[in-house]
């Protein structure tokens, strides 16, 4: 008779258990839908889970179809360690059971610790992990292989730096300031390098020539005083983050004060050459004209002499003829 209350209690709990099992079965993806096994996702190690409790969550999605002609890529910027949830969805008119799903990191295939599920004509795959160091940065790609392969890629990188795109021009003896910024990010440390080749040399802060200043955490400034022509080279600013480093270079061109005068001097030289050419041409023309006038004058004199001689010769016969008639 004492067993009755226990039996009644067990019978009372049975509907609740059945209801709970039904709910779990409904929420669990079935193999008939072409999904993965019951638990395709392997949880990260306990230590990483504990560390990840205080990390922010980064969730990103990529959508693909059987008609996608090009791989789809998405760039993601990370400054600090984070929990990451990547989801790819693939829509096809074919059989979802015939689609092979894989994940790769930088070309190397990942373990089967990702989730695959299907809804209607769409196949979903989800990869969850935690990025805690620079080795886990890189490219994560999901692949759907049917008749042809479709790929979606998530590119993880640290924030980019922004300097001056065009070369910075200054003059010998002046001072200049090089600036690097990181928008909406705060690096742990800044470093400046100079390079006129493939070798980068750290800028000596102890020298009076260089002054490094960082008024704000997201920017750094390098002041160079008493510029020389050999100071014209590439300068690199490097920002250190928890997940890696980022660099930006600024080109510095140092000119002497004679350089701006060169175009003016060239113009002056061209003007002088043009004026000299014009003067020589005029002098040559005048000289030629003078010779021409002298030649004409000489011809006129010769013509006059010729006319005079002809006149004298004509007068002599007439004089003789008159003498003969007089006799």
Swiss-Prot record:
One record GO biological process: axon guidance
SUPFAM superfamilies: Immunoglobulin
Leader peptide range in chain numbering: 1-32
One function term, GO molecular function aspect: cell-cell adhesion mediator activity
Span list, region Disordered: 287-327
Residue intervals annotated with topology Extracellular: 33-260
A Gene Ontology cellular-component term: plasma membrane
Modification Phosphoserine occurs at: 309
Transmembrane segments: 261-281
Disulfide bonds: 88-142, 180-237
Compositionally biased intervals (Basic and acidic residues): 291-308
Major place of residence: membrane
Recorded superkingdom: Eukaryota
Location(s) in or outside the cell: Cell membrane; Synapse
Membrane protein topology class: Single-pass type I membrane protein
Topology feature Cytoplasmic, residues: 282-327
PANTHER family given in the database record: BASIGIN RELATED, EMBIGIN
Cited function: Plays a role in the outgrowth of motoneurons and in the formation of neuromuscular junctions. Following muscle denervation, promotes nerve terminal sprouting and the formation of additional acetylcholine receptor clusters at synaptic sites without affecting terminal Schwann cell number or morphology. Delays the retraction of terminal sprouts following re-innervation of denervated endplates. May play a role in targeting the monocarboxylate transporters SLC16A1, SLC16A6 and SLC16A7 to the cell membrane.
Protein name: Embigin
Gene from which the chain derives: EMB
């Amino acid at each position: 008779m004492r067993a009755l209350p226990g039996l009644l209690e067990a019978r009372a709990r049975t509907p609740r258990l059945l209801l709970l099992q039904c709910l779990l079965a409904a929420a669990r993806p079935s193999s008939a839908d072409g999904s993965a096994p019951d638990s395709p996702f392997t949880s990260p190690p306990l230590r990483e889970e504990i560390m990840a409790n205080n990390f922010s969550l980064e969730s990103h999605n990529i959508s693909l179809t059987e008609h996608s002609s090009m791989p789809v890529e998405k760039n993601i910027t990370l400054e600090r360690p984070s929990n990451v949830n990547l989801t790819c969805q693939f829509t096809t008119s074919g059989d979802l059971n015939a689609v092979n799903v894989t994940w790769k990191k930088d070309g190397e295939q990942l373990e089967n610790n990702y989730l695959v599920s299907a809804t209607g004509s769409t196949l979903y795959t989800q990869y969850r992990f935690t990025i805690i160091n620079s080795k886990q940065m890189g490219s994560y790609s999901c692949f759907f292989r049917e008749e042809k392969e479709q790929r979606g890629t998530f590119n993880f990188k640290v924030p980019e730096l922004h300097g001056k795109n065009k070369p910075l021009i200054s003059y010998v003896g002046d001072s200049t300031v090089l600036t690097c910024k990181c928008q909406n990010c705060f690096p742990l440390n800044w470093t400046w390098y100079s390079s006129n080749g493939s070798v980068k040399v750290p800028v000596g802060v102890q020298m009076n020539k260089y002054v490094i200043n960082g008024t704000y955490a997201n920017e750094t400034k390098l002041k160079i005083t008493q510029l020389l022509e050999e100071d014209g080279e590439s300068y690199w600013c490097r920002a250190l983050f928890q997940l890696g480093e980022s660099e930006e270079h600024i080109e510095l061109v140092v000119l002497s004060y004679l350089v701006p005068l060169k175009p003016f001097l060239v113009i002056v030289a061209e003007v002088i050459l043009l004026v000299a050419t014009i003067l020589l041409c005029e002098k040559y023309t005048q000289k030629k004209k003078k010779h021409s006038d002298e030649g004409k004058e000489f011809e006129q004199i010769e013509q006059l002499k010729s006319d005079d001689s002809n006149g004298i010769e004509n007068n002599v016969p007439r004089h003789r003829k008159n003498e003969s008639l007089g006799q």
